[in-house]
Design a protein with these regions (language model features):
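Sec-dependent bacterial lipoprotein signal peptides
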Residues: 1-13
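OB-fold and OB-like single-stranded nucleic-acid-recognition modules
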Residues: 11-184
């Protein structure tokens, strides 16, 4: 009787392979998702896509800007660094609504670039986590490719910014994440 119980209890046992973290691909054949590489590879196409569908910022602001590709020029009122989410406060001619901001370094928030582009769709990713990581990586590309080379500081107040980007509404402000930007 003991041998029957022992045989039944050991029947479900097998050899288990412990896979070290980061080496899963060598066992499954599936490469780990690299949001940085994906966004870097896609960046030029994303920029062209957003540029191709960007509407004039003053027209978009009048009709609601959430998730919209925009382009235009504006006067820089200030470079706000009071929080880690640095941004330019800008004045768009003909618009008297809430504050308009352009993200400008430090910490970026939102998914506006990902949501405004049509190069990649949710279905191109394995799950929501990868889709979210892709949005964050696109924001990082915007910082590296667009904002950081400008070395923005407080001296930009009063200058004109020309931009193309993706707009999102929230908290009484419209925030634009740039994919192209110049300051003169």
């Amino acid at each position: 009787m003991v041998s029957i119980v022992l045989a039944v209890s050991l029947a479900g046992c097998g050899i288990v392979t412990v896979v070290p973290i980061g080496e899963e691909a060598s066992f499954t054949g599936k490469e780990a998702f690299d949001s940085g590489a994906q966004s870097s590879d896609d960046w030029s196409a994303v920029v062209e896509d957003i540029k191709g569908k960007a509407a004039d910022v003053s027209e978009v602001l009048a009709n609601g800007a959430d998730g919209t590709a925009v382009s235009g020029s504006a006067k820089i009122v200030e470079f706000n660094t009071e929080t880690p989410k640095h941004y330019l406060v800008v004045e768009v001619e003909g618009y008297s609504g809430g504050e308009v901001r352009i993200q400008a370094g430090g910490v970026y928030s939102g998914t506006a670039i990902r949501d405004a582009q049509s190069v990649k769709a949710f279905e191109d990713f394995a799950n929501q986590t990868e889709w979210s990581q892709y949005a964050k990586a696109l924001n990082q590309e915007a910082d590296t490719q667009v904002v950081a080379p400008l070395s923005i500081d407080e001296s930009v107040a009063g200058k004109t910014v020309t931009f193309t980007g993706a707009a999102a509404e929230g908290g009484g402000a419209v925030t634009i994440t740039p994919v192209e930007m110049t300051i003169e």
